[in-house]
Every structure is written in structure tokens, then in C-alpha cells.
């Protein structure tokens, strides 16, 4: 990789201006090399309070702006992203370590999200009116107010965008805190919003660590939209347990199962399993963590080919040639945590099929791992956010479903099977928000809702259903002229 110049932060984005930060130093690194990429500052308490103030000040005007005008700004944002497509894709790869092909796909998702969000808003929150004998029954929707969007590092542009765009379309103003791992990507996204001509104060960006996030959540806000770990989502939920008026949309990952049935095309099963478990270095919330495999010749052959495919998988920096399938996990610190988690599973009785190991010192580059947990005692129901698959063997299909449901989470689940009846049985009994058949567990569409049950979420699915948590319904009975009804209720006398 060629030597990179360190990106100096533009500062915090408040009231339509970049303001040089005064807080503690914040840095992001390229996880494939460990080199410093971006340098800036954490937002101070004063900067956070000021951002909240200007967001409230901008709210009335923005909420009263017509939907068509708000949509025009989002389309202007798309035009800016298009202009910066190559730069944004490269920056995503530099800051997350993703292969360039995957970052380019993410940029396309950012662009496509706007029209889908406009369509979803018009379908799910469009005003309706019904005439009755006595009055007009009207349904309209209002924005919540000032909402906080907490970004995730694995899709630093797309996932945040999936909250921001619907929130703005609905008339909310936004306080955006990106992941501390991906501040450079956030700055470019915000610059695109700035160049779209969006009015000052409608979106504000505050860079910082978890402490900044906590300060932000203590402000006068009306909603929090979060994508991340269960532990962080639970803390947010607990922080607002005495404030039921705050709407929370929490997407918190999962310990997702993928069941392999008796299939004819083993190579196809391996391919879809690779996309389920290893894509994005296992750092998608929908990645399959538990692979449930028949204890049969089919299962043995599948595991043999799956392990071989993992060994042959290309891993490296985004600009390596030939192109890698995956890059690093987000940091060296996280890589070490994942290796420690693997060690703990071995101590519980897990049998290593393919060891996950650190490939380059002081980076996030780790090789994929596979461990057989069939005979392990009390394996933890935890999400290991890495290219790491836990294998469980089963003897009959009912047992496979039982194993799949042995989790407190419920985000995604998948079945690879030639048997439609088995899929119908699987679909009926599996508890998850995304259930796929002969597709990777990571396969999702922005034209559908995205969210889970159990510890994976709080019944506020995003994607196409994000419009639902960005506005609240208002029911009105209306008539333009005040009149006394021809038939009055008994016992009521007017003089």
C-alpha cells in the first residue's frame, strides 16, 4: 500500500458549519496496516449542547417544509454522493478495511436508499382522509422532533443513512454521532449533505467516543436510532427506562443460525455458507454464527469443502491484487478479543476444525476459523463479530430447528435445503425477523423491513419500515363549520 497522508478533521458540523473541535484527540486507523488515517477531536459537552440547541431551533421551519421540498434535498444529497462515489468507496475501504468491491456496493446502497425511503414514506405515512356522516376522519403524521442517530462501523455510510434519510423526510432534525472507528467516512457523508443545500441545523455531526454518545443522549431529544451490539443497546434502553416518551429504534445483532439440510449441490451450500459467515470479515449483524449440519455423509462432505474454501479464501488489504474476499476486522484490539473468545470455546469443549489466527501483527487481519461445538458444555449465547463459524451436528430435522432456536437473539436465520416442506416447517417454527431459504443469511433488501426479535431489537425494524419510527400518527375528526347536530343527545338542554 502506498504511503497515506493523514486526514485532518474538519471539526464538528454544527448549524451548517464546520467548527474546529476542542475536545480530546480522536484518531482512526487503517485496520489492514495499523497506520494512522484520520485525526480530530471528540466533541465537548458545550459543542454537543450547542448542536442540540440549533437542531431544536431549526426544527419548526424544517417540519413545516413540504414533503416535496424535503425530498428534493435528499435527492440533491444523492447527486453529491454520485459526484464523490469513488472517493467515498475508497475512504470506506481505508477506514473499515473492506475490499473495494464491497465498499462500492455500499455506496450504491447509500444512493438507492433515498428513492426507497421516499416510496416508503408515501406508502406508510401518507395522509389519509375519510368522510363520515358527521365529520371528516383525517390521518396525518408528525415528526418526533430532534433525534439522535448513532452510527455503526461495519457499514459506516449505509446504516447511518438508513436512519438519517427517513428521519429528515419525516421532518425531524438530526444529531448524528458516527462510530469512533469511522469518522472520516462520516465527514464526507456530512459534506455531501452540506453541499446539497440542506438548511443549517437540520443535520449536525458530532464526532466522539462512547462518553460523547452518553452526553448526547442526556440532551433534550425525542428519539434515538441505534445500530450496534446488544450490550450498548441495552444500556441505551436502561438509560431511557424512565422516559417512555422517547422513541428508541434499536438494532442489536444476533447469534444467527444457518441450517444445512440434505442437499444435492454441496458446492452451492458451501458458497452460500461463505457469504453467510465470512463476508465483511464476519462483521455483519446478519452473519451466521452457528452452522447446523447433519451428522451424515452429506454433512461430512459439506464440512470438508467448507473448511477448504475458508483456507483458500483471499484475505488482505483492499488494494491487494488479486482482490481479496475479506479484509481485516475493525481493529487489532478486536482481533485479539476474537482470538480470546475462540480460546474460551476450546476450553468449553469445542474442537477446532480450522483455527482463527492473527495474520499480521498490530492489524485486524485474521484468518477464518471453524470450531465444532457439538459436544461443548454450555456454550455462550454471544455474537462473535468475526470470520468465525461454530458447527453443531444434528440427527433429524426437528433437532436442527431446536438447535437453531437455542438463542435469546432473533435477527436472521437461514435454511439451505432442496425440501420445500422442510422450509415451511423451518419458517413456521423459527423465531427471527429475517428468515431466508437457499440464500445467505446476510441477504437483505431495502424494499423490505430489517429487524429482529428477542435481544436483536425492540420491534422497530429499519429499512423499508424506518418510516414507522420517524413519525407518529395524528387522528383528527374535522368539520369546517361549527354547528349543532340536528339530533341532540337526551338529557342535554341548551337555552
From Swiss-Prot:
The active site is at 251, 285. It is an enzyme of class 1 (oxidoreductase). The keyword Nucleotidyltransferase does not apply. PANTHER family: ALDEHYDE DEHYDROGENASE-RELATED. Its EC number is 1.2.1.71. Catalyzes the NAD-dependent reduction of succinylglutamate semialdehyde into succinylglutamate. It catalyses: N-succinyl-L-glutamate 5-semialdehyde + NAD(+) + H2O = N-succinyl-L-glutamate + NADH + 2 H(+). Pfam families: Aldedh. The gene is astD. This is N-succinylglutamate 5-semialdehyde dehydrogenase. Transmembrane segments: none annotated. GO terms for molecular function: succinylglutamate-semialdehyde dehydrogenase activity.
Amino acid at each position: 500500500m502506498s504511503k497515506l497522508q493523514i486526514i485532518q478533521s474538519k471539526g464538528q458540523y454544527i448549524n451548517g458549519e464546520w467548527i474546529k473541535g476542542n475536545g480530546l484527540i480522536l484518531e482512526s486507523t487503517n485496520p489492514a496496516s495499523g497506520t494512522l488515517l484520520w485525526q480530530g477531536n471528540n466533541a465537548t459537552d458545550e459543542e454537543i449542547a450547542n448542536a442540540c440547541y440549533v437542531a431544536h431551533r431549526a426544527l419548526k421551519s424544517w417540519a413545516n417544509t413540504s414533503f416535496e421540498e424535503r425530498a428534493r434535498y435528499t435527492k440533491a444529497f444523492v447527486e453529491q454522493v454520485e459526484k464523490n462515489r469513488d472517493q467515498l468507496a475508497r475512504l470506506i475501504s481505508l477506514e473499515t478495511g473492506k475490499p473495494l468491491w464491497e465498499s462500492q456496493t455500499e455506496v450504491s446502497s447509500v444512493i438507492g436508499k433515498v428513492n426507497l425511503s421516499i416510496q416508503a414514506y408515501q406508502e406508510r405515512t401518507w395522509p389519509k382522509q375519510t368522510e363520515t356522516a358527521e365529520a371528516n376522519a383525517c390521518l396525518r403524521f408528525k415528526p418526533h422532533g430532534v433525534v439522535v442517530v448513532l452510527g455503526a462501523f461495519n457499514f459506516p455510510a449505509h446504516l447511518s443513512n438508513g436512519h438519517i434519510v427517513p428521519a429528515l423526510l419525516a421532518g425531524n432534525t438530526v444529531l448524528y454521532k458516527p462510530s469512533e472507528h469511522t469518522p472520516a467516512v462520516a465527514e464526507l457523508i456530512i459534506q455531501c449533505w452540506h453541499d446539497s443545500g440542506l438548511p443549517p441545523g437540520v443535520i449536525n455531526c458530532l464526532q466522539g467516543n462512547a462518553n460523547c454518545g452518553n452526553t448526547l443522549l442526556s440532551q433534550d431529544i425525542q428519539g434515538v436510532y441505534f445500530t450496534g451490539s446488544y450490550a450498548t443497546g441495552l444500556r441505551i434502553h436502561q438509560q431511557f427506562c424512565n422516559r417512555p416518551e422517547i422513541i428508541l429504534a434499536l438494532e442489536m445483532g444476533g447469534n444467527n443460525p444457518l441450517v444445512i439440510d440434505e442437499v444435492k449441490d454441496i458446492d452451492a451450500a458451501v458458497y452460500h455458507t461463505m457469504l453467510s459467515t465470512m463476508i465483511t470479515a464476519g462483521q455483519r449483524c446478519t452473519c451466521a454464527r452457528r452452522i447446523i449440519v447433519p451428522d451424515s455423509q452429506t454433512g461430512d462432505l459439506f464440512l470438508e469443502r467448507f473448511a477448504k474454501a475458508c483456507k483458500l479464501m483471499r484475505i488482505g488489504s483492499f488494494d491487494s491484487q488479486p482482490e481479496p474476499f475479506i479484509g481485516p476486522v475493525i481493529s487489532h484490539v478486536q482481533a485479539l478479543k476474537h482470538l480470546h473468545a475462540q480460546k474460551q470455546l476450546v476450553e468449553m469443549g469445542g474442537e477446532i476444525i480450522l483455527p482463527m489466527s492473527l495474520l499480521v501483527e498490530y492489524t485486524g487481519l485474521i484468518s477464518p476459523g471453524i470450531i465444532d461445538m457439538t459436544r461443548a458444555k454450555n456454550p455462550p449465547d454471544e455474537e462473535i463479530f468475526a470470520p468465525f463459524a461454530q458447527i453443531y451436528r444434528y440427527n433429524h430435522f426437528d433437532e436442527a430447528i431446536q438447535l437453531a432456536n437455542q438463542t435469546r437473539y432473533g435477527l436472521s436465520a437461514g435454511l439451505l435445503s432442496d425440501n420445500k416442506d422442510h422450509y415451511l416447517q423451518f419458517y413456521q417454527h423459527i423465531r427471527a425477523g429475517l428468515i431466508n431459504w437457499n440464500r445467505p443469511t446476510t441477504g437483505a433488501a431495502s424494499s423490505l423491513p430489517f429487524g429482529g426479535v428477542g435481544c436483536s431489537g425492540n420491534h422497530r425494524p429499519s429499512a423499508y419500515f424506518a418510516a414507522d419510527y420517524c413519525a407518529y400518527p395524528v387522528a383528527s375528526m374535522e368539520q369546517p363549520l361549527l354547528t349543532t347536530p340536528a339530533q341532540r343527545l337526551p338529557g342535554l338542554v341548551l337555552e
